[in-house]
Amino acid sequence: MNEIRTQVQFIDIDEDMAGQRIDNFLRNQLKNIPKSVVYRILRKGEVRVNKKRVKAEYKLEAGDVVRVPPVTVEVKENEPAPPSTKLSKVAELEHCIVYEDDHLLILNKPSGTAVHGGSGLHFGAIEALRALRPQARFLELVHRIDRDTSGILLVAKKRSALRHLQAQFREKTVQKYYYALVMGHWDAECKVVNAPLLKNEVNSIVRVNPNGKPSETRFRILEKFAEATLVQASPVTGRTHQIRVHTQYMGHPIAWDDRYGDRRFDAYTAQFGIERLFLHAANIQFVHPASEKKLEIHAPLEAHLEQALTKMRQA
């Protein structure tokens, strides 16, 4: 058996920390401690705010002083190690950071990396970043992208930045552009796809359905190949698998899409070295939460995808 030990902490709550529930705050502070332990120390009154017991739903206020008790947890040797013990596997994410300042961090997420742990995954990009930056007081996802999609992922470093950026996403003022390699020749006249999407809650498959949620994606052709088209896709709404389903609906599924793709097209693109979902969040434009100035960030394609496109041009 191995042990994880933490020391007692006294934390002064500032404006950036204020507004969040104490249970969520503790789960962020005690990164490698099981959720059940967090709720146990709350229930037993070991966590104090201004020297008083609080319930899990208590919302922190600026000026609060939180006492986080020392915690010891036993971990079986055959259990997955916490992210902090897997730095050799996640350190490569440090090289994927394309922008960083005091308020936010932007990652060019590799394909195959989940944005967060869960569904059988013990850690994702956010857990890895927290392990790489143990001194960071606050790191939270602003939005999400699919595990197999690569590209831009925004992470807030302050709660005020998180609120500001998420408000922009809600108000649909954030502009996102994806690169997708789709089967066949995309019709240049097809610039907007408006098709409602409905998610099956049992198998998570999304389909175009008149009873679904309104969904809109804008498309632009970037380059045509013999049997494929590289398109730029800009989702106006943010539905699950939206670009993937809209391209399939139009008869042009994305290369190597294991849910909505075409195996014959996958075999065709494999000869050029493509063996992953060719969907990449390439560009984002938004208002910086502190400077209030418009910020545009570009995340380059992985080298092997660029090489694949070069081979397709020469074919």
UniProtKB/Swiss-Prot annotation:
Enzyme Commission number(s): 5.4.99.24
Entry annotation: catalytic residues: D146
Disulfide bridges in this chain: none
Keyword Isomerase attributed: yes
Alphabetized UniProt keyword annotations: Isomerase, RNA-binding, rRNA processing
Gene Ontology molecular function: any one: 23S rRNA pseudouridine(955/2504/2580) synthase activity
GO biological process, one term: enzyme-directed rRNA pseudouridine synthesis
Enzyme class at the top of the EC tree: isomerase
Catalysed reactions listed for this entry: uridine(955/2504/2580) in 23S rRNA = pseudouridine(955/2504/2580) in 23S rRNA
Residues in S4 RNA-binding domain copies: 20-94
SMART domains in UniProt: S4
PANTHER family in UniProt: MITOCHONDRIAL RNA PSEUDOURIDINE SYNTHASE, RIBOSOMAL LARGE SUBUNIT PSEUDOURIDINE SYNTHASE C
Functional note: Responsible for synthesis of pseudouridine from uracil at positions 955, 2504 and 2580 in 23S ribosomal RNA.
NCBIfam families according to UniProt: PRK11025.1 (NF008249), rluA_subfam (TIGR00005)
Family: Belongs to the pseudouridine synthase RluA family.
Annotated protein name in UniProt: Ribosomal large subunit pseudouridine synthase C
Protein's organism: Vibrio cholerae serotype O1 (strain ATCC 39315 / El Tor Inaba N16961)
Annotated gene: rluC
